[in-house]
Amino acid sequence: MAPKKKLQLPPPPPTDEEEYWDSQAEEVLDEEEEMMEDWDSLDEASEAEEVSDETPSPSVAFPSPAPQKLATVPSIATTSAPQAPPALPVRRPNRRWDTTGTRAGKSKQPPPLAQEQQQRQGYRSWRGHKNAIVACLQDCGGNISFARRFLLYHHGVAFPRNILHYYRHLYSPYCTGGSGSGSNSSGHTEAKATG
């Protein structure tokens, strides 16, 4: 028998992967350079604004950004990592939901009516909120701080601590001095009859 010759396929033409990778790297570097130029131009603009705010003299001439761009173009060999973008402005913390009143920074000069309201007022009746106060105090076990925050959040009214203490004392089963039923006369008559 005649020896069979193995059919050998010619090797595939070499792909220019190296050229492909180089072209991708060049594209990435071009994009990075453009981004850096954009950041540089933003930095220069912000610096120019800061300088113009500090010294308003019109005789100060700013250098043109074109020569600086040529000097700031990094070479491929020296660039190891892209520069981080400039820091964002510091955000103020969100206002807590349980804080009340106006902050000093909101308005420079409050309206005259608000100045009058800031003064101490006389007696105010909390009777309209009695049911909400008593129910909240009973549900939270007489915790004044929690009841204050809860009522402020859900009813939008900042109840004074002394009012909550008063209603806890009168209507709460957790305090010994309170009647627990809401009626002052029934608790005192039972104490007199037994004692």
Curated annotation (Swiss-Prot):
It comes from Human adenovirus C serotype 2 (HAdV-2). It holds the Pfam family Adeno_L433K_22K. InterPro entries: Adeno_L4-33K/L4-22K. Component of the packaging machinery which encapsidates the viral DNA into preformed capsids and transcriptional activator of the viral major late promoter (MLP). Binds, along with packaging proteins 1 and 3, to the specific packaging sequence on the left end of viral genomic DNA and plays an active role in packaging of the viral genome into preformed capsids. Specifically binds to the 5'-TTTG-3' nucleotides of the repeats making up the packaging sequence. Forms a transcription factor called DEF-A through cooperative binding with packaging protein 1. Residues 15-53 have a biased composition (Acidic residues). It comes from the Viruses. Its main location: host cell. One of its GO terms (biological process) is nuclear capsid assembly. Belongs to the adenoviridae splicing factor family. Residues 54-63 have a biased composition (Low complexity). One of its GO terms (cellular component) is host cell nucleus. It is found in: Host nucleus. Keywords: Activator, Host nucleus, Host-virus interaction, Late protein, Repressor, Transcription, Transcription regulation, Viral genome packaging, Viral release from host cell. This is Packaging protein 2. All late proteins expressed from the major late promoter are produced by alternative splicing and alternative polyadenylation of the same gene giving rise to non-overlapping ORFs. Expression of packaging protein 2 and splicing factor is controlled by a L4 promoter distinct from the major late promoter. Residues 1-124 are annotated as: Disordered. Induction: Expressed at the late phase of the viral replicative cycle. Probably already expressed from the early to late transition. Part of a genome packaging complex composed of packaging proteins 1, 2 and 3; this complex specifically binds to the packaging sequence on the left end of viral genomic DNA and performs packaging of the viral genome. Self-assembles into higher-order structures.
